[in-house]
């Protein structure tokens, strides 16, 4: 090979280290070595590949030629380091600090070291013993760890089923016992039960809600309601409860005041002064200071009197008139009970003193519908205690002749004869 300096050839050198001829043709690609030009050199590697693994000692960091295998922990070091620690008096393994019984010497290639886990490094004299160690110590342990982790995660993925009967013991401080039936054994999940309890807790209970203080009415006399029972809603609304035709009830039932319809489409106005006493035995009447809002935990039974009207679904709608204190009853068109006449004076005609200057007429009377059940906030306890605000019986406007029972039905006969005109619903 001719070795000539690079400047004697007709080539140009660029910054990338390539030589080009003057004809802009690529001649050769060489390394940038000043003053030399390399040619093609063949290299032959003589030797054999060593398949035996080479391990390094953990103490001296040198390749191990002769292993010093410690029994019983089976950790291996170079033979010099293993004997050095034994001579000095350290009768424990330098890696695991386990007591040393003896030290075995093995040549390179006769020891198989576990490399599955970096911290293990236990040695075995055969490949079969090494595989048994890997299956026993590493694969089974890995499966156990995986199954244990799945058991910890599983309750969060699928919560266990809980019976409703077991929940009141856990929620005693949350006042949910009254909303959970104790004898139900329905299997439901815990989130749905909490959602159901939260909804029942947020719903207003009609039978335990107390009326607002500004709408509580106090009458100067006990009013007995027979055909309807009034209880308050969330905002003090009056609701009519349907009755049952059963006159054997011994408990006290509220009695409505007498009323009469006006042409079957006008709201009837009645006064609570003329209430005929009943012959049945009742509990002591409520005090005059107690509100009119009666709580009926069970469906009221029908205690029928001459003053009661046959009630069917939908029931009557009652409300108070703010200007005069009258009780206005909306009579549905399907009410076929005979209207009752108003009490008369001694000569048989309405008394002239009953028509006071503060009484209202039918034109000024507000028209109430069946959906309008709220009390007017203008009616206060002061108006209820004032006896002058409760007028006597009177007719508001002339009405076409309607069917009416004889006067003896109101005063002479017993009220038990009036019960035969009522039917169950």
Curated annotation (Swiss-Prot):
Regions of compositional bias (Pro residues) in chain numbering: 398-408
Pathway assigned to this chain's UniProt record: Protein modification; protein ubiquitination
InterPro entries found in the cross-reference section: HAKAI-like_RING-HC, HAKAI/CBLL2, Znf_C2H2_type, Znf_Hakai, Znf_RING, Znf_RING/FYVE/PHD, Znf_RING_CS
Zn finger (C2H2-type) start-end: 112-138
Region (Disordered): 241-297, 382-425
The EC number(s) this enzyme carries: 2.3.2.27
GO molecular function: ubiquitin protein ligase activity; zinc ion binding
Keyword flag GTP-binding: no
Keywords tagged on the record: Cytoplasm, Metal-binding, Transferase, Ubl conjugation pathway, Zinc, Zinc-finger
Gene Ontology BP annotations: protein ubiquitination; regulation of cell adhesion
Keyword Transcription regulation recorded: no
Its job: E3 ubiquitin ligase catalyzing the covalent attachment of ubiquitin moieties onto substrate proteins. May operate on tyrosine-phosphorylated SRC substrates.
Domain comment quoted from the record: The HYB domain forms a phosphotyrosine-binding pocket upon dimerization, and mediates as well the recognition of its flanking acidic amino acids.
Protein name in UniProt: E3 ubiquitin-protein ligase CBLL2
